[in-house]
Amino acid sequence: ATKTPSLNINLNNGFTWNLNSNASAQNADTTTALFDNLTLSSGAVLNGAFSDAGANNYIAKGNVASDAGIINLDNPSHAKYDDVLTIDGNYTGSNGAQVRMNTLWNAPGDENGADSTSDVLHITGTAGGNTIVSPINTSGTANIIDGNVQQVASVLNTIPVVIVDGDNAAGTFTGTAQTTGAAEVQLTSRGAGAGREYYWTMNAKPIIPVDPVDPPVDPVDPPIPPVIYNPSVPAYVEMPRANMELGYATLATLHERRGENQTLAWDECGTCGTDAKGQTWGRILGKHLEQDGKTRLNMTSNIYGIQIGHDFKIKRTDKGAHQLTGVYLSYGRSNTNFYDNYRAVNGIISDDKYTGKGISDSASLGLTHTRYAPNGSYLDLVAQLSYLHNKYQSRRGVDVGQNGFGAVLSAEVGRPYALNKHASNESGWMIEPQAQLIYQYVDLKGFNDGIRQVDQGSQSGLRGRVGVRVAHNAQSSGDDYQTNTFYGVANIWHDFLNPKAVSIGQDRVGEKYATTWAEIGLGVQRAVGKHSYVYADARYEHDLGKTKRDGYRGTIGIKHTWK
């Protein structure tokens, strides 16, 4: 018996086979390359877009295996979207196999691929393994789709760019592409007869449950699937909020920042404040805060800081009131992880919501002025100016930095009331209603991450609180007695302003957060010398609505009054 001859071709090490009018392996016709098996390995290229003149339409008749190989439909000018390569056989891809092509996608677009055109890979047999589809834009940059399509409140897809007639599993072909806006484009698929077709989408589909619902429910019109965001977008949108939380944590409340300074009126039988030359203080602080957005974006921040200050002027009046005026320097850092509830992989919403992280550093200068009345009432005024530096790191490896500044103004008042009668040198309880209003302004410099322009602009925050502090002041006997303080605190905080949307390319993206939350805490101050104290404060906060805000923070400090 006569054996049928076979032709098996192995290409490797970057070798390129250009399909053109004379490229037929067995010269069957001018557009067909005929073989039994073709293996592409180690960067070898099957080039189906050799010419810029007219549409390239070739047939590779046989089975193709791509082991880190490349099927190329990207023509030399990168500006033609009508090339077609048909593999008339079966196909497998492995080890980072690629398909490179040109795709154009303009607005407005629709679910069926209107306003899009593309090169196409058509496989008549089966397909297996995994192959990455990479769109090449007009400048030759990979993973960017040409055109001006942008996120809108409707489903947006392209025409199919890979068509498989035979059996193949979803995810055989995958890919992601950038836009110059907030959206990311992902390759997804749908059944088409006995096979499957792959297309680019801007919308994330939910995972379809495998088990049927029992009892069955009547069908309803599905909501519009959410837009797929680029992994950098949550950080770009939420970083101004993270910067503000760092500013608020640095300023804090009077008792977190300074402990109990009424001891100037109590210690040494009320004579401590009369000859005080100044007070030097320092503290370290830490905070963990988890915030969910009302729409889709969440973040978790860990804040650390150190603060050193000095009151260069302490003034005491004849009526027993005293005033402290001083400055402080602070360094703070915030490490923030960002999340997207609709993060998608291959066009399907993923269980892994993490999108990237950000690091914020701040250097702050503060000016303080605190006034205590003879009855213990106080007014605390603070102005704080901060230099900010942010560094963004998305899970895709995009690494970019920016600078900015922040300014904070705070006014806090309180009035203590004795809960039991006691002499000035006796222990006693008191209750102190408090209120505070903080205005913060953050301005971040715009930047370009290499794909899109990001402008967060200026953001303003107005945060207020009302609360109460219950304190026990224990005073030792003797001429030089010191005052040890223990207290509990409860507050209601409220944000009066919502963050503004951020411009990302031609898109604007915003997020809103919990506006009201409760806080409880404990604090202590102990004398460690005739004129020195250590103090500490720890607090827990939780939202009072349906949107999550959950966190805890603490500080420990030391202060010394100079005589």
Model region roles, listed by residue range:
Residues 22, 30, 34, 39, ...:
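Membrane translocator/pore-forming domains, dominated by Gram-negative outer-membrane beta-barrels
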Residues 64-65, 90-91, 121, 152, ...:
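Short beta-strand element of the conserved SAM-dependent methyltransferase core
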Residues 18-24, 48-51, 74-75, 103-108, ...:
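Short regulatory "switch" loops immediately downstream of catalytic or recognition motifs
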Residues 100-106, 111-112, 117-118, 134-323, ...:
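Outer-membrane translocation/initiation segment of Type V secreted surface proteins
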Residues 83, 87, 221-228, 413, ...:
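Intrinsically disordered low-complexity regions specifically enriched for long asparagine
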